[in-house]
Amino acid sequence: CLKIFKPDAIVETGTHTGETTAYMAKESNLPIHTCEIDKRYYSYAKLRCQNFDNINFYNNSSDIMLEDLRAQLKDKRIFYYLDAHFFDDLPLKREIEIIHNSSESYFIMIDDFQVLDDAGYGYDNYGKKGVLNINYIEDLVGKYDLQLFYPAIKSEAETGYKRGSIIITSLCEVSRVTEIGTLRKVK
C-alpha cells in the first residue's frame, strides 16, 4: 500500500505497545506521528521504539493529536492508521471527520474492522457504542463520498492474526488505490 500511495508521513492513532509503530518505522523510514492516551502503554511504546529517530510520540487522545497536526501536515500525502479503539471512547468518527476536513488526499486504514462478506476476519464489537463496520460509519460515507476497500484476500488464505480492516480514501485517490492488488472496492 505504501509503495503505491507514496505518503510523506504516517499518522497512527492508538500506539498501544508500539508493535505496529516499530514495524512501520523500520519498513518505511517515513516520519511517524503516533498517539496513545494510556500513559503506561505510551511509556512502554516509547521505550520499545527508542532506537527509531523517525517516530514522534504523543500522550494524547487521537482527536487532539490530529487537530494539532493539521497545519503541519496540510498539503501532504498522509497514510493514516486508525487503531485508537480500545477503552471507553470510540473516536473513529471524529478521526475521520478531522482527516477529511484537513486534506483532499488521504489514505486511511482502520484496523479491527468487520469485513461484512467474510466472517473469518475478526473485528471489534463495543456493544452499545458500536461495532466497527460500515454501518457504524455509513453517515460519513454518504456525507463525504468516502471510497471504501476491503482486503481482496479471503480470511482462510491469511496467515497470522486474521483481523479485518478497511481502507478509506478520498475520491481523488481511487485510481491509485485500485492499483493495489490486495484490495477490492466495497460495493
Q: Language-model segments: what does each one mean?
A:
Residues 12, 36, 83, 111-112:
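Acidic active-site catalytic centers that drive phospho-/nucleotidyl reactions
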Residues 78, 86-186:
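C-terminal substrate-binding/active-site "lid" region of AdoMet-derived donor-dependent transferases
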Residues 73-82:
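Short SAM/SAH-binding signature in class I
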Residues 65-74:
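Short conserved loop adjoining the S-adenosyl-L-methionine
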Residues 27-29, 50-52, 75, 103, ...:
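Short, well-ordered coil/turn elements that cap or connect secondary structure elements
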Residues 1-66:
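SAM cofactor-binding core of SAM-dependent methyltransferases
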Residues 38, 63, 85, 113-114:
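Catalytic metal-binding/acid-base residues of hydrolase active sites
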Residues 9-11, 85-88:
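Short, flexible loop segments at the rims of nucleotide/cofactor-binding pockets, characterized by
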